[in-house]
């Protein structure tokens, strides 16, 4: 297989890259280790609302991915899912051979690393027998809010994810218990105020300072969560249908460290103006990219994608881009109608 650009990572920024490259008449193959496109947006919080995407006062993560894929579809990007990039070999001075864990080989003229935070796994609480309950009544992400309709939920954690999902699930749950080691929650003040209002209304109960201690149930279905007070060691038993532990994610850049590119604190160092890495024709965008003043926002990743694609065009064609506004770029026929 042969293409212009291989994009490593099928998160929102990686998918948008296929659109932006297509606008410059460059083809893309997108490779991702997950079994569906969307990165963390679909794997961890598909129904979580996002508020900082231009033109959308609010949009769920899943809907954003669907819209981005539809936007890119006229340019027919090729997705290689459930595959991890294992090797990047120089074919010659102007191309690479990218090899995946499935044995797929793609020849390309440039590579864009849009790997987000790398390969991620949720931090599992050290509870005996928790594996028996995982994906049955213990979950580390929420795929369908409706699954929690009229259920009793224990949410553990004190960061943004725990607080945000408490607010969202309180709209459908029968009762939510929020377990945290400290009295203060590490979330934005607006969300903290919402938690206080929900607690005063009786919709949720903030149980602090406590930590998870034991699980009880049968055949993977929870019946109760036992918690322990941090200071007094007192134990409490909370009847529950579901446990949602939100203790963050452990990140691993995987094989990126062996690709002969400069790294800094598990991030890929790039030139801010072009998003070039230390290796010719390899670029990095989105959360994985590092430069002075970097903002880890989806919006910023979209801008980086655009800058990288424009620079790749100049490198591949040895000439500047004949700039066109998208309003004057007509895409018809086989590539569908964007207008």
Swiss-Prot record:
Keywords: FAD, Flavoprotein, NADP, Oxidoreductase. Coiled coil: none annotated. It holds the Pfam family Pyr_redox_2. Homodimer. Its cofactor is FAD. FAD binds at residues 32, 40, 45, 85, 120, 287, 327. It catalyses: 2 reduced [2Fe-2S]-[ferredoxin] + NADP(+) + H(+) = 2 oxidized [2Fe-2S]-[ferredoxin] + NADPH. InterPro entries: FAD/NAD-bd_sf (IPR036188), FAD/NAD-binding_dom (IPR023753), Fd--NADP_Rdtase_type_2 (IPR022890), Ferredoxin-NADP_redctase_2 (IPR050097). GO terms for molecular function: ferredoxin-NADP+ reductase activity; flavin adenine dinucleotide binding; NADP binding. It comes from the Bacteria. It comes from Wolbachia sp. subsp. Brugia malayi (strain TRS). Its EC number is 1.18.1.2. Binds 1 FAD per subunit. Belongs to the ferredoxin--NADP reductase type 2 family. This is Ferredoxin--NADP reductase.
